[in-house]
Amino acid sequence: MAYKLKSHRGAAKRFKKTASGGFKRKQAHLRHILTKKTSKRKLHLRPKMMVHKNDHGLVSRMLPFA
């Protein structure tokens, strides 16, 4: 019996595939211990980032149906 492909559930919650084939991700360090971080630092952590090309294969392997 063939192995059933499944998405990595942790990766499915963290990455979204874009129309051009890349993956969006949220930046880290914005969940807790925010009082010591400056407003400027928190502002720069807000926008979504793209997954680096070196990690693209790893993420796409974890999300076979994305």
Swiss-Prot record:
Annotated stretches, region: Disordered: 1-22
Biological process according to GO: translation
InterPro entries (alphabetical): Ribosomal_bL35, Ribosomal_bL35-like, Ribosomal_bL35_CS, Ribosomal_bL35_sf
GO-annotated cellular components: cytosolic large ribosomal subunit
Record-level Gene Ontology MF annotations: structural constituent of ribosome
Keywords noted in UniProt: Ribonucleoprotein, Ribosomal protein
Pfam families xrefs: Ribosomal_L35p
NCBIfam families assigned to the protein according to its UniProt record, in alphabetical order: rpmI_bact
Family recorded in the similarity comment: Belongs to the bacterial ribosomal protein bL35 family.
Record-given protein name: Large ribosomal subunit protein bL35
Gene name tied to this protein: rpmI
